[in-house]
Amino acid sequence: MNRQHKIGFIVFALALVLICLNYLDPVIALNNYIFIGLNSVGAFINQSALTFLTEFGNAAVLLIASVIPVYYSRKFFRLIISSTLIGIFLSRGLKILLDIPRPGAIVQREDFFVVEPLLTSQSVPSGHAFSLFLFFSCLVVSGMIKKNYFALLIFAFLILAFTRVLVGAHWPMDILIGASLGFSLPLLLASLANRSSKILDTLYSVFFIILLCIALYTMLIGNFSTYDFANEIGWLYILIFLSPLLFLNLVKI
């Protein structure tokens, strides 16, 4: 077992421990206390800005963001596809299995801040945190993140992930569990990224094109987010992540 696999297993085990702790009464009370404290900060931030930031964790947005790394790294390409396909089933499966309700289903509406709509479905793990840290881990494992920037980027991704608490969509533990699970997957699948196979690469390409087309379509028609404001500016996320690639290719010409 190499170092990446060991770290992956440790982080995955941490996620499982957090899931178990999530059922203890003292942890539930602490989770609620921290939620109320962090969530109250959201009331002092512009709702449009909060919505814009929190949707950077949307899977469709991150698929668009992955286009540039995919363009430059075959390893990242293999990792993001394999991790995403497994991650979809893992994240959704845990939500159904654990069936822990969101804050909106438990906390009185007048006791916390929420960016509409009020979400009340399954809470654990946070899909946005899962997707953010899966994407970040793919960048790390594929060698696209310099060590000097690792801590800074971890902090930035955590800020984005915890906006889910600020908008009233998730408990703090949901974020930690989602981030741990998402970060562990590419580490556990790292060996797949080093295997060169024309058949696998062709399949990966097909899956990536399908997922990318779905993401682009839903963002362009304004149907990728639960938030109306995000749906109105889906084009902006596309512009942010695809314009650098267009610029670099124009420079080459």
Language-model segment annotations:
Residues I28-A29, Y71-L153:
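Membrane-interface loops
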Residues I7-I19, S83-G87, I154-L158, F208-I214:
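Alpha-helical transmembrane segments
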Residues M1-V61, G93-L118, K252:
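N-terminal transmembrane-helix/juxtamembrane module of multi-pass inner/ER membrane proteins
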Residues F12, A60-L63, I80, T84-I88, ...:
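Alpha-helical transmembrane spans of integral membrane proteins, capturing the lipid-embedded, hydrophobic core
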Residues L63-V67, L187-L189:
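Canonical alpha-helical transmembrane segments
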Residues N2, A43-N46, V67-K75, L79, ...:
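Juxtamembrane/transmembrane-helix boundary motifs in multi-pass membrane proteins
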Residues I36-Q47, T51-F52, I81-T84, A179, ...:
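Loop-to-helix transition at the N-terminal end of transmembrane alpha-helices
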Residues F113-V251:
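Membrane-embedded catalytic cores of phosphoryl/pyrophosphoryl-handling enzymes
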